[in-house]
């Protein structure tokens, strides 16, 4: 009898606590998870606007117009980030969504709105997904209009778009005459958008600041520049660590395209290691023609990713706007490569062609070896050759340097390279001293190790 009374009492308390509470209160929403069957039959457009804030970092609230409970978490005085994905041929959620939301909330009190249009983007027919992009933009405009009516400002709107999502972001920006704060395009989709006029794709006039990264220009991405600044990591194609043959399956098709997202996520925490060097072409960058960052003083060359807006004032005033910047990356997260230029002037009377390997050493014994351009260099008397050297470690202070010269030949005589001056210029950390070594001889295939010294005249 007492036990029955106890359980009945618990039931009554539970009913009283739940009485008056809506069905949706406290409910967490998740990104739409579909499959290849949905892709084959096609999906009608249905958009979820999943809100994450410091108050609900793990429990998304849907901001659909018929759902008022989600708006209690939306603080319009904060900056709002819209993250919009692209084409989803298999229907599965993007693997990066949880990570990018978490990283944004770790660095600042944002409203993060994940634009889930998986129902619409999931189809085997890419053009069907592309045809829905303007409808998604219309839905986003209705939400932004609602936010503006509650006190939000267009300055506080930041749109991050992936592939088709980049063009969706551009369409939203056009409806506000380019007044929204910022758009970042992560490898904007190329198919059906290449060669289109500005009103039919992302363009630098769509926001106060538009920055773009291109990682798959020979495949799924857009090749030409679109923003106030366009970054081309590894030249915009063939990203390190991505499969080179179709034998790798689906990764072969999507890895380069998707790398743009992972580079951007890394930039949220790196805060400065992925430095882009303005240049006309990737080749010019590789041969050392693009090291002058004086136009950005007192800043360095622009940093790729989230912190690129620090260079906004320098970039938007260009007439016409449009800066291409290049940098190289490692194959894995955090993707950082530390760049130097190795300048060599020789006084050998005969021209020599060969390869240079350089190793840097620190006081505690750490060693990092250069990843130099694969092309051989031609060393002519009194002509300086600049080689781009890339290292996967940042050694500071650097105590010793070793250099090896080789022609790559396994037969024939061994050559000497008489060096008048060798200069190592830091590009990633430009505040560090330029290091030199003067008047020495490199014997072919013999490693020469020495202590570097500050250059006597860095203007030489």
Swiss-Prot record:
The active site is at 163 (nucleophile), 187 (charge relay system), 257 (charge relay system). Disulfide bonds join 242-255, 279-290, 293-301, 436-455. One of its GO terms (biological process) is lipid catabolic process. It is found in: Secreted; Cell membrane. Its main location: secreted. Keywords: Cell membrane, Disulfide bond, Glycoprotein, Hydrolase, Lipid degradation, Lipid metabolism, Membrane, Secreted, Signal. SUPFAM superfamilies: alpha/beta-Hydrolases. Residues 1-26 form the signal peptide. Pfam families: Lipase. GO terms for cellular component: extracellular space; plasma membrane. It catalyses: 1-hexadecanoyl-2-(9Z-octadecenoyl)-sn-glycero-3-phosphate + H2O = 2-(9Z-octadecenoyl)-sn-glycero-3-phosphate + hexadecanoate + H(+). The keyword rRNA processing does not apply. Glycans are attached at residues 67, 75, 177, 289, 366. It comes from the Eukaryota. The keyword Signal applies. InterPro entries: AB_hydrolase_fold, Lipase, Lipase_LIPH, Lipase_N, TAG_lipase. GO terms for molecular function: carboxylic ester hydrolase activity; phospholipase activity. Its EC number is 3.1.1.-. It is a peripheral membrane protein. Hydrolyzes specifically phosphatidic acid (PA) to produce 2-acyl lysophosphatidic acid (LPA; a potent bioactive lipid mediator) and fatty acid. Does not hydrolyze other phospholipids, like phosphatidylserine (PS), phosphatidylcholine (PC) and phosphatidylethanolamine (PE) or triacylglycerol (TG). Belongs to the AB hydrolase superfamily. Lipase family. This is Lipase member H-B. It comes from Xenopus laevis.
């Amino acid at each position: 009898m007492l036990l029955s009374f106890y359980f009945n009492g618990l039931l009554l308390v539970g009913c009283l606590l739940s009485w008056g509470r809506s069905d949706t209160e406290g409910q967490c929403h998740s990104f739409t998870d579909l499959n290849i069957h949905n892709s084959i039959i096609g999906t009608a457009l249905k958009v979820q606007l999943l809100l994450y804030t410091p108050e609900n970092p793990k429990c998304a609230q849907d901001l659909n117009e018929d759902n008022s409970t989600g708006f209690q978490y939306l603080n319009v005085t904060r900056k709002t980030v819209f993250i919009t994905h692209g084409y989803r041929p298999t229907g599965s959620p993007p693997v990066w969504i949880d990570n990018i939301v978490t990283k944004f909330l770790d660095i600042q009190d944002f409203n993060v709105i994940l634009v889930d249009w998986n129902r619409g983007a999931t189809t085997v027919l890419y053009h069907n997904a592309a045809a829905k992009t303007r409808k998604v933009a219309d839905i986003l405009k209705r939400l932004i209009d609602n936010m503006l009516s509650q006190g939000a400002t267009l300055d506080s709107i930041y749109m991050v778009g992936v592939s088709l999502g980049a063009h969706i972001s551009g369409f939203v920006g056009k409806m506000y005459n380019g007044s929204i704060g910022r758009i970042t395009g992560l490898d904007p989709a190329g198919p059906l958008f290449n060669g289109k006029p500005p009103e039919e794709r992302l363009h630098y006039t769509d926001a106060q600041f538009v920055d773009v990264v291109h990682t798959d220009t020979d495949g799924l991405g857009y090749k030409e520049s679109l923003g106030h600044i366009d970054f081309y990591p590894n030249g915009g194609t063939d990203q390190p660590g991505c499969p080179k043959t179709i034998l790798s399956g689906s990764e072969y098709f999507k890895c380069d395209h998707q790398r743009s997202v992972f580079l951007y996520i890394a930039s949220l925490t790196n805060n400065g290691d992925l430095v882009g060097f303005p240049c006309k072409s990737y080749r010019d960058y590789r041969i050392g023609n693009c090291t002058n960052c004086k136009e950005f003083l007192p800043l360095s060359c622009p940093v790729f990713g989230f912190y690129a807006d620090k260079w906004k004032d320098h970039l938007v005033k260009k007439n016409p706007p449009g800066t291409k910047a290049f940098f190289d990356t490692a194959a894995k997260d955090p993707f950082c490569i530390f760049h130097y230029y190795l300048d060599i002037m020789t006084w050998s009377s005969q021209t020599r062609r060969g390869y240079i390997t350089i190793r840097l050493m620190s006081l505690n014994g750490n060693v990092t070896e250069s990843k130099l351009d694969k092309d051989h260099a031609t060393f002519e008397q009194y002509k300086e050759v600049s080689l781009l050297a890339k290292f996967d470690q940042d050694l500071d202070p650097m105590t010793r340097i070793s250099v090896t010269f080789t022609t790559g030949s396994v037969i024939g005589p061994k050559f000497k390279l008489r060096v008048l001056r060798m200069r190592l210029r830091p590009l990633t950390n430009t505040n560090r001293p330029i290091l030199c070594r003067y008047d020495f001889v490199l014997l072919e295939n013999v490693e020469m190790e020495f202590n570097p010294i500050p250059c006597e005249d860095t203007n030489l």
